[in-house]
Amino acid sequence: MKGFEEDLFLPPQVLSENIRAIAAHQSLLEERRICELAEMAAAASDYLKTLSEDGMPPVDAFSLLSLEEDAAVIHEGALEAAHPYLSAHGKNLSAMDKTVFISLLADRLAEKKLCPEEADFLPPAAAKEIFTYVKNLYADEAYDVFAQGFDDPRLFYSESLKDAVSAVAEGRAGYCLLPLEEKGGIRLASISQMLYRSDLRIASVTPVYGYGEETGLTYALISRGFCIPPVEGEDDRYLELRLPKESCPLSELLSAAEFFGALVYRIQTLQLEGESEPRSFYSIVLRAEGRDFVLLLMYLFTFVKDFSPIGIYSNLEA
C-alpha cells in the first residue's frame, strides 16, 4: 500500500519557471501594445497638426479624429492616409488602450508645440454683466457671492424661475441664479429639465445657508456659454457632463476619469423631455483638485460622441 505522501501532487520546479515565463511574455505583449499605441498617437498627432494648420478648432479636430467610426468624412486638408489607419486600429482598442492612447497623444502634440487647453474644447463666451433671479433670502445671499467676481454687475428680478431662464436664453440677461440642490444635496429635477431645454451652462455654484442654518441650499450661476475658472493651488474644480445612457459604458468612462485624475463627485439618472420622446441620461459631476480636465476632454471628444458638457466650475464658499 502506498504511503499518503506518495499520493500527494507535488508541483515540479518547472511550475515556478512557467509562471515567470508567462509573466515575461505578458510584459512583452504589453510593451508591444504600447508601441502600437505610440504609433497610432504619432499618426493622430500628425493628423491633428494638419487640421490645426488648416484653421480647424481643436474641439472639431478631435471630433473628426473619431476612432470608432468609418473614415467616410475627412477634412480636405487632412492627411488622408492617416485617418483610415487610425479608424481601422481604433476599433480594437480596449478601455485601457484608450486612456494610454490619449496620454501618448498629448505627449506627441506637446512635441509639436500643440498643447490643447480646456477653453479649446469648451470655448468661453462673453456675457453681459446683467443678473436676474427670483428674489428671496437664499438668492440674495448667492448673488452677493457671485457678484464679487464681476466689475459692474447689474440686476433685475424675475417673477419665476422659468422667466429667469428665458431672460438668459433670449439674451436679456447674461446670467441667472437658480437653486440647483435642495438641503441634503439632492439635485432639483425641474432645474435640470430647464437647463436641458434651453441648452444652458453652469458657470459657478455656491452653498447658501439663510439664517445660519447648518444645512443649506446650493445655488448655481447659469449662462449661455462656458466660463472656465483658473486652476489655483489645490482648489477643487468640477466638470459636469450629461450623456444618454446608451452613449458609452458608464464604468469605462469613470475608469478613464480616474486615470486622468478626476474623481466622481456625483452621479444621478435623469429622465428629460425634449422635442421628441423622453430620454434617460446620466448626470455626472467629476472633481479634480488643483488640476485641469484637458486629458479627460481629449478622451471625451475622441471616444464619447454623444455627450453634453454642462460646465467647468468652482464651488464658491459663501
Name these PLM-found stretches:
Residues 1-318:
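Domain-level signature for soluble enzymes in the chorismate/prephenate branch of the shikimate pathway
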